[in-house]
């Protein structure tokens, strides 16, 4: 509004000021000009008084309202609000008035309000400068001042000091762990995280201690703006210094915790890399020791009394300064000395407790302490073991033997590293466990590679050549598996059994129903469950076909007539030279044996109608003919008995039999056979 706009009264102020310049002082006139009608001597004081009155009555209220508006607009912006309130209070408190501060505040605000109008800005600045030359005391708005002070007091003094510390410390060089880990520091990843320079030992000594006290004094100097005293009583000082250290060491610990949490050992791509990494960690310039040295140097601090004494000395230095600031500093120095053992130390104590376990890993000469030495010895053994496994033309076989031994309980350097690491504090414990775990994973991977080669060369190749896509594994195949091939593959000490015993058995366990991979440290061979399932099928097939003779397939079974259509007079089942003839009447089971010795296993079922007409089915493809004939029949478990019901349908004529095997699982239940499919890779 015009009542608030200083620009609106600028012409009037200019006119009033120029009027004071019309008459020169009498001392500046020639002698003849002083005589006669010259009225300057009595007029100049009147004009000046009028101009000063306009400055006080027109310009000053507008400036005050201008400042009040800025205060209201920035109640949520503490830094701006503090400057606005300070300038506003200077209008009403001559004892705290600083002309340069007021001039700067108004010049900045007018530049914002009247951007581009340099002439008007210059004119207003000149008028305000003349206003400052005369005494005045503007009646401030106590309600607004109280509101502003309440807003300012929402942020504690310690937070203000800490905020200023952080802002002023931005010029400090940033800290990165990777710049201090030596030539082999690349074994660590994530060590490039930036830590602000304030949160280092150098930042603590050269900035926090050196600048903390002076910032307290600078802020205390503004306490009059808050309506508070510029000195601190013992309780206030204790609280302030305690809160400042709490804020600082809380963030200090957070920065170092976060930086260390990002550090990890580089992932391994081979056992050679694992050997190199273990070797680097125990080398003369071990990056692990270098990292621990950096942690200790930057997270080990003086005791509470020593720390406070340093702050006291800093305050005492400033106390030697002359003037009000020196007096305030002297008060702080005196009170700090008296309270040296009373400042709360919770945040610092927490930081020291957090990192003390890492400090203990080093001796006073920055070497490995007795807590760390066993781990370094275990790492040396691991380096040698991994190097041995990764060398030579038979490295895969050596790795396979190593994995087999460890899976079966033999201790190794990997176990020693795990045991030693478990006694160390994190994150060192995590790093070394990761090294051991990654190395073990690589060992298992190389063992799998070796095992997969053996599998493809010794088992899968035989399977594809002799069994794959042949009957009885494929029900509709026209090609039968040679009985000799079947025998050599599935018999005890046959192809499948030898492969399992030689290569797989050390790595698996059997719970009575299925095979499971054994694991150590939560890891097992990276092979698929499919192969284990197929090894289970091998066992099922062996128990069904080789129960009578471990070296030859042999099935003894009995066939018992169950029912015959009334239109049939008899049914004749034949396997080689073995026969069961059934007519209506007493049921007499017959014993059979497969494979049949005669007629190459020719199998048939012939039924005869009452009229004498005969019809039937016959299979003569070799020893698997019996199974092919049974495949033409409907099979189902017979309720209440461990037998299969065979239901033959020959042109609508039905004959049913009960098939009883002396072994379990029933070899004529071909579920395991039909599900037997070896994958191309483990």
Predicted region positions:
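C-terminal domain/tail detector
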Residues: 2-682
């Amino acid at each position: 509004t015009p009542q608030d706009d200083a620009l609106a009264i600028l012409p009037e102020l200019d006119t009033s000021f120029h009027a004071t310049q019309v008459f020169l002082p009498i001392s500046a006139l020639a002698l003849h000009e002083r005589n006669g009608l010259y009225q300057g001597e009595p007029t100049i004081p009147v004009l000046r008084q009028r101009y000063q009155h306009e400055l006080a009555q027109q310009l000053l209220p507008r400036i005050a309202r201008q400042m009040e508006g800025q205060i209201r607009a920035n109640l949520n912006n503490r830094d701006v609000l503090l400057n606005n309130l300070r300038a506003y209070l200077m209008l009403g408190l001559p004892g705290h008035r600083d002309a340069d501060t007021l001039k700067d505040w108004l010049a900045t605000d007018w530049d914002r309000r009247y951007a581009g109008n340099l002439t008007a800005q210059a004119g207003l600045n000149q008028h305000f400068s003349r206003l400052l030359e005369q005494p005045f005391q503007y009646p401030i708005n106590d309600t607004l001042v109280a509101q502003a002070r309440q807003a300012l007091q929402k942020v504690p003094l310690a937070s203000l000091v800490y905020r200023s510390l952080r802002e002023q410390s931005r010029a400090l060089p940033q800290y990165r762990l990777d710049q201090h880990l030596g030539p082999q520091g690349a074994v660590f990843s994530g060590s490039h995280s930036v830590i602000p320079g304030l949160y280092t030992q150098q930042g603590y000594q050269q900035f926090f201690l050196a600048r903390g006290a002076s910032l307290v004094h600078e802020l205390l100097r503004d306490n009059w703006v808050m309506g508070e005293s510029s000195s601190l009583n013992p309780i206030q000082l204790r609280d302030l210094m305690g809160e400042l250290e709490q804020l600082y060491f809380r963030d200090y610990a957070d920065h170092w915790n976060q930086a260390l949490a990002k550090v990890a050992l580089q992932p391994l791509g081979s056992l050679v890399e694992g050997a190199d990494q273990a070797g680097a960690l125990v080398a003369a310039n071990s990056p692990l020791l270098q990292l621990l040295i950096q942690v200790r140097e930057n997270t080990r601090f003086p005791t509470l009394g020593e720390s406070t004494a340093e702050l006291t000395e800093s305050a005492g230095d400033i106390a030697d300064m002359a003037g009000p600031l020196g007096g305030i500093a002297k008060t702080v120095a005196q009170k700090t000395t008296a309270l040296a053992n009373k400042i709360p130390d919770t945040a610092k104590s927490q930081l020291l407790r957090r990192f003390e376990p890492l400090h203990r890993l080093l001796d006073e000469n920055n070497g490995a302490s007795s807590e760390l030495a066993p781990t370094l010895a275990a790492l040396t053994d691991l380096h040698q073991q991994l190097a041995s496994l990764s060398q030579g033309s038979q490295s895969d076989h050596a790795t396979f033997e190593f994995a087999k031994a460890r899976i079966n309980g033999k201790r190794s350097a990997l176990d020693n590293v795990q045991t030693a690491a478990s006694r160390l504090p994190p994150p060192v414990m995590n790093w070394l466990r990761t090294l051991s775990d990654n190395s073990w994973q690589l060992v298992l991977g190389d063992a799998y590679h070796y095992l997969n080669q053996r599998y493809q060369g010794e088992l899968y190749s035989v399977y594809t050549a002799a069994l794959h896509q042949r009957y009885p594994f494929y029900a509709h195949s026209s090609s039968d598996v040679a009985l000799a091939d079947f025998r050599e593959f599935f018999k005890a000490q046959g192809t499948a059994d030898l492969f399992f015993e030689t290569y797989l058995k050390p790595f698996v366990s059997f719970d009575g129903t299925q095979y499971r991979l054994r694991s150590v440290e939560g890891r097992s061979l990276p092979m698929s469950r499919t192969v284990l399932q197929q090894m289970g099928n091998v066992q099922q097939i062996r128990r069904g076909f080789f129960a009578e003779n471990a070296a030859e397939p042999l099935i003894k079974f009995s066939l018992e007539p169950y029912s015959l259509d009334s239109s049939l007079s008899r049914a004749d089942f034949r396997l080689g030279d073995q026969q069961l003839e059934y007519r209506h009447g007493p049921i007499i089971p017959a014993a059979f044996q497969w494979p049949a010795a005669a007629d190459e296993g020719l199998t048939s079922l012939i039924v005869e109608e009452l009229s004498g007409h005969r019809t039937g089915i016959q299979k003569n493809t070799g020893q698997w003919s019996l199974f092919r004939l049974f495949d033409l029949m409907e099979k189902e478990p017979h309720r209440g008995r461990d037998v299969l019901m065979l239901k033959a349908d020959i042109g609508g004529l039905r004959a049913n039999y009960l098939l009883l095997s002396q072994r379990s699982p029933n070899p004529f239940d071909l579920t395991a056979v039909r599900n037997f499919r070896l994958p191309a890779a483990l």
